[in-house]
UniProtKB/Swiss-Prot annotation:
This is tRNA1(Val) (adenine(37)-N6)-methyltransferase. It is found in: Cytoplasm. GO terms for cellular component: cytoplasm. Transmembrane segments: none annotated. Its EC number is 2.1.1.223. The keyword Methyltransferase applies. Keywords: Cytoplasm, Methyltransferase, S-adenosyl-L-methionine, Transferase, tRNA processing. It catalyses: adenosine(37) in tRNA1(Val) + S-adenosyl-L-methionine = N(6)-methyladenosine(37) in tRNA1(Val) + S-adenosyl-L-homocysteine + H(+). Specifically methylates the adenine in position 37 of tRNA(1)(Val) (anticodon cmo5UAC). Belongs to the methyltransferase superfamily. tRNA (adenine-N(6)-)-methyltransferase family. GO terms for biological process: methylation; tRNA processing.
Length: 239
């Protein structure tokens, strides 16, 4: 999903100044997360603003305010421009902060926090700093994200994330130690015979029975499954 811009049904993402482009991970999370009952939403590491705009579209009939924070200055400027060109500029606010700084200054408590966080920990790092920030955990570790959730979630609020399998298991263990419990989980397989590559999770402060499902993206190369199409049809132009 490269290129300088990506068009969705109700908004366009320009991304020539963003380190991380529109991808399947962010699109999946934005389409899957439960927005019902949320009035205040926080998108941590918004990048292009994709997830914030997807949630704004999904909550168009509701009174929902969305804050989006992004540490990289160029990405935050472009995300703000993407928001300003959308129909939801009155409800989505983009701020150029690290989540560590935002925790210190934020007075709100959120009903929903979402993040498509970086997950490379011990891999070689790209030369460009912006790419490093976007892809590596140095600037948004699992501990940072969980600390933000513990401090900024309301008592009934939820945290929604997407991680590769190993990191997802580690994240869930750390979350439980801090009193955040997985109540909804989606295992994502690229194709039927390929193992799970991504896990989406919703966590809350209340321990509830786990709802677990599996989503397969493609039947074969370039042929999406009906389940995936159902999930993203409100966004992808093709459907």
């Amino acid at each position: 999903m490269g290129g300088n811009q990506f068009r969705f049904k109700q908004f366009t993402i320009r991304q020539d100044r963003c380190a991380m482009k529109v991808g399947t991970d962010g699109t999946l999370l934005g389409a899957w997360v439960d927005v019902s009952g949320a009035e205040k939403i926080l998108d941590i590491g918004t990048g292009t603003g994709l997830i914030a705009l997807m949630l704004a579209q999904r909550s168009s009939q509701l009174k929902v305010d969305i804050d989006a924070v992004e540490i990289d200055i160029n990405s935050s400027i472009q995300a703000r421009e993407n928001v300003e060109r959308s129909r939801w500029s009155d409800r989505v606010k983009v701020e150029n902060y690290s989540i560590q700084k935002y925790i210190d200054i934020c007075q709100k408590r959120y009903d929903l926090i979402v993040s498509n966080p970086p997950f490379f920990e011990n891999a070689s790092k790209p030369v460009k700093k912006a790419r490093t920030v976007a892809r590596h955990t140095d600037f948004l570790s699992q501990a940072d994200l969980l600390q933000a959730a513990v401090k900024l979630l309301s008592d009934t609020g939820k945290l929604a994330v997407i991680y590769p399998v190993e990191q997802a298991h580690n994240f869930q263990e750390k979350a439980e130690y801090l009193g955040l419990f997985c109540q909804r989980k989606l295992d994502v397989k690229p194709m039927p015979k390929i193992p799970t590559k991504r896990i989406l999770m919703e966590l809350s402060k209340k321990k509830l029975p786990l709802q677990k499902n599996t989503l397969t993206i493609e039947v074969k190369q370039y042929t999406y499954t009906p389940e995936f199409i159902t999930l993203i049809k409100d966004f992808y132009l093709k459907y």
